[in-house]
């Protein structure tokens, strides 16, 4: 038999060589796929765990939760890595992202907050309430562990427009057990047909022991609002910030004037017939200040003990005192005290030494503290006479003399 030729020998030696190369290629491919899988798992883990880290630091409130080693808006607790059992749950959750609150409506409470440089007063800033305060959840780690939930509000600031509702809400947000929507939901007056599920979804997440709040000052003058809120929960606590109705009306007009400089004068809008001294109660700036009339609708659905009436004047002169009453009413520990405030002489009202989650002073923005136009003294006198009987009735109904007729 003839010995194998060169071609046959080459074919025989090439076969084991090709099998060896194939096995090496397969091994490298498996190693590459395994490495990619491990990298993917690690990347997913890092993304999931990034929430607590991001939540511990930050700049402006709109861009993210501000902080200084604590988590904004919640109990001041240090973030620690979860136990092994909790890590497993944590890995199954999507990466947490902040939700911006809905844009505020044009209802007269558009005030923003200004962040000041330490030692300065009235400096412009970049964070705000309403449209610019981010809903940074309290205890981000706890929320990532599915320990927080969205609840319907247990307390609502229902009024009044230009009474000081924005200031009250922002002061309350300093409290670690208060979680509030920054923007005004306007659910019970404009969006009721969207349903309670939609309303609940607007709320920030809360932990056990925390209170969910919102404020929409137009509720107080909305006829349907009392019945609608009662239908949601008869136990809802209601807060009304009231102010001298004459001053409130002028402030209301001043705000409108800043947006529409071509409107008639305050004096011409106040009277149906100035000669006869007949006040035009259909003008909203006047109508809102008839507090006793609006309160009657609320008392048909809520007992007076479930309503707290906050003085807008005292909120300026003694913010800590009024906040003490509010905290008691809400069943909260008195954490907000004098140490949280300083009086800004330039603006003429108190500011927070430390706003929610910030290490710098915050004041209500440029839209607050506008200079009021000069109003005819005779018009002011007639307005005071008009409001006096309504004020006296309001004092009797609430059991509190606000001193607007002194």
Swiss-Prot record:
Outcome of mutating residue 365 to A: 43% loss of enzymatic activity
Q: Which reaction does it catalyse?
A: alpha-D-glucosaminyl-[heparan sulfate](n) + 3'-phosphoadenylyl sulfate = 3-sulfo-alpha-D-glucosaminyl-[heparan sulfate](n) + adenosine 3',5'-bisphosphate + H(+)
Changing residue 366 to A does what? 99.8% loss of enzymatic activity
Effect the entry attributes to changing residue 162 to A = 99.6% loss of enzymatic activity; no HSV1 entry activity
Question: Which EC number applies?
Answer: 2.8.2.30
Which regions are flagged for Gly residues bias? Answer: 120-129
- Record note on what altering residue 194 to A does: 99.5% loss of enzymatic activity
Residues engaged in binding substrate = 166, 184-190, 215-218, 255-259, 283-284, 367-370
> Which BP terms does GO give this entry?
branching involved in ureteric bud morphogenesis; glycosaminoglycan biosynthetic process; heparan sulfate proteoglycan biosynthetic process
Q: What protein does this entry describe? A: Heparan sulfate glucosamine 3-O-sulfotransferase 3A1
Q: Where does this protein come from, organism-wise?
A: Homo sapiens (Human)
At the highest ranks, the source species' classification is: Eukaryota, Metazoa, Chordata, Craniata, Vertebrata
The gene behind this protein is: HS3ST3A1
């Amino acid at each position: 038999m003839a010995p194998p030729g060169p071609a046959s020998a080459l074919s025989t030696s090439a076969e084991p060589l090709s099998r060896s190369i194939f096995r090496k290629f397969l091994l490298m491919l498996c190693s590459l796929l395994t490495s990619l899988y491990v990298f993917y798992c690690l990347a997913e883990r890092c993304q999931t765990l990034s929430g607590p880290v991001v939540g511990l630091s930050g700049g402006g409130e709109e861009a993210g939760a501000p902080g200084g080693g604590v988590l904004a808006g919640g109990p001041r607790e240090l973030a620690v890595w979860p136990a092994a059992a909790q890590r497993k749950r944590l890995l199954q959750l999507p990466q947490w992202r902040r939700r911006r609150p809905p844009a505020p409506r044009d209802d007269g409470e558009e005030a923003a907050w200004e962040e000041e440089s330490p030692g300065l007063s009235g400096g412009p800033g970049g964070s705000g309430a309403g449209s610019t305060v981010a809903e940074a959840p309290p205890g981000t780690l706890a929320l990532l562990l599915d320990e927080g939930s969205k609840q319907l509000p247990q307390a609502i600031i229902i009024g009044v427009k230009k009474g000081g509702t924005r200031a009250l809400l922002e002061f309350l947000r300093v409290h670690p057990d208060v979680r509030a929507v920054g923007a005004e939901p306007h659910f019970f007056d404009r969006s009721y047909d969207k349903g309670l599920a939609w309303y609940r979804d607007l709320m920030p997440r809360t932990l056990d022991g925390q209170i969910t709040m919102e404020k929409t000052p137009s509720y107080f003058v909305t006829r349907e609002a009392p019945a609608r809120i009662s239908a949601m929960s008869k136990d809802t606590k209601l807060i009304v910030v009231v102010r001298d109705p004459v001053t409130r009306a002028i402030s209301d007009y001043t705000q409108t004037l800043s947006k529409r400089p071509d409107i008639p004068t305050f004096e011409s809008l106040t009277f149906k017939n100035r000669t006869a001294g007949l006040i035009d109660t259909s003008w909203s700036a006047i109508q809102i200040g008839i507090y006793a009339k609006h309160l009657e609708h609320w008392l048909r659905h809520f007992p007076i003990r479930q309503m707290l009436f906050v003085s807008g004047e005292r909120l300026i002169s003694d913010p800590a005192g009024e906040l003490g009453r509010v905290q008691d009413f809400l069943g909260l520990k008195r954490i907000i005290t004098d140490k949280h405030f300083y009086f800004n002489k330039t603006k003429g009202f108190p500011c927070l030494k430390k706003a929610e989650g910030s290490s710098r002073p915050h004041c209500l923005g440029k839209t607050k503290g506008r200079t009021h136009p000069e109003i005819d003294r005779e018009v002011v006198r007639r307005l005071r006479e008009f409001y006096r009987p309504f004020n006296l009735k309001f004092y009797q109904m609430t059991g509190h003399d606000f001193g607007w007729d002194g």
